[in-house]
Amino acid sequence: MQGSVTEFLKPRLVDIEQVSSTHAKVTLEPLERGFGHTLGNALRRILLSSMPGCAVTEVEIDGVLHEYSTKEGVQEDILEILLNLKGLAVRVQGKDEVILTLNKSGIGPVTAADITHDGDVEIVKPQHVICHLTDENASISMRIKVQRGRGYVPASTRIHSEEDERPIGRLLVDACYSPVERIAYNVEAARVEQRTDLDKLVIEMETNGTIDPEEAIRRAATILAEQLEAFVDLRDVRQPEVKEEKPEFDPILLRPVDDLELTVRSANCLKAEAIHYIGDLVQRTEVELLKTPNLGKKSLTEIKDVLASRGLSLGMRLEDWPPASIADE
């Protein structure tokens, strides 16, 4: 195997051992050292907590007002019945919520096969036992709400939010939406040519039958990849630093002093002092101008009057003067 020392190995699906319809082992190799645990732990957490599925969330049993009661002619108490319903494996197509009904009488077990449902619902394990009737005259009728969701949602989180709307006799059930019942991974040593420091990831999992184990791993990998897309397309979202713009000067300050139409004497005195723009002139004080050779009080008065007619005066302060357009000249 030739390649750059910085090039990562890409794993390939080596083997899928289908132990049963709900139990499978998936082997993935080769992986760079350490990536077996990195990928295995990430997939395990997603498979246990983030896989969508369907679960029983509410139950109404005729003649039962609360979960701490019993029903005549039924071997199990209500809490046991709710626990058995919690393990019901249901596959629902095209709907987020369905209501199932169950009516059974006479001695014998009550199983998932006794549930009445429409064509959008499939009971995966019809032999799943819900309760047992112990008397010929015993009967049980119930309405079962099945909803689609993700992860695990205990009934306690819904009690307070639904207290005002939930009628007496409607029993809430802890909802375990995840179709994955058990998952474990193991990292073993792998070898590719001369490299012996590689990983082999072996994932073993069991589902409730509503999803194929191979499909479950495929979905988990898709979820992980979608979450990582934000890092793949990472962009610097920081706001660009806004540079403080220097204040713009009044256009009149950028005009040459010749535009003031001063007398020749005054204009020549200003040019001799390198005062070429009106902006240069207004920053001078009266004392500074009087020190200018050949510029007397009469010329000073003329300059002040001309500036005043334009809304300007001597002794003004102009920050960042001269502007770049003048400084470059």
From Swiss-Prot:
It catalyses: RNA(n) + a ribonucleoside 5'-triphosphate = RNA(n+1) + diphosphate. Its EC number is 2.7.7.6. Residues 249-329 are annotated as: Alpha C-terminal domain (alpha-CTD). Residues 1-235 are annotated as: Alpha N-terminal domain (alpha-NTD). One of its GO terms (molecular function) is DNA binding. CDD domains: RNAP_alpha_NTD. GO terms for cellular component: cytoplasm; DNA-directed RNA polymerase complex. It comes from the Bacteria. SMART domains: RPOLD. GO terms for biological process: DNA-templated transcription. Keywords: DNA-directed RNA polymerase, Nucleotidyltransferase, Transcription, Transferase. It is an enzyme of class 2 (transferase). Pfam families: RNA_pol_A_bac, RNA_pol_A_CTD, RNA_pol_L. The keyword Transferase applies. DNA-dependent RNA polymerase catalyzes the transcription of DNA into RNA using the four ribonucleoside triphosphates as substrates. The N-terminal domain is essential for RNAP assembly and basal transcription, whereas the C-terminal domain is involved in interaction with transcriptional regulators and with upstream promoter elements. Belongs to the RNA polymerase alpha chain family. Homodimer. The RNAP catalytic core consists of 2 alpha, 1 beta, 1 beta' and 1 omega subunit. When a sigma factor is associated with the core the holoenzyme is formed, which can initiate transcription. This is DNA-directed RNA polymerase subunit alpha. It comes from Salmonella choleraesuis (strain SC-B67).
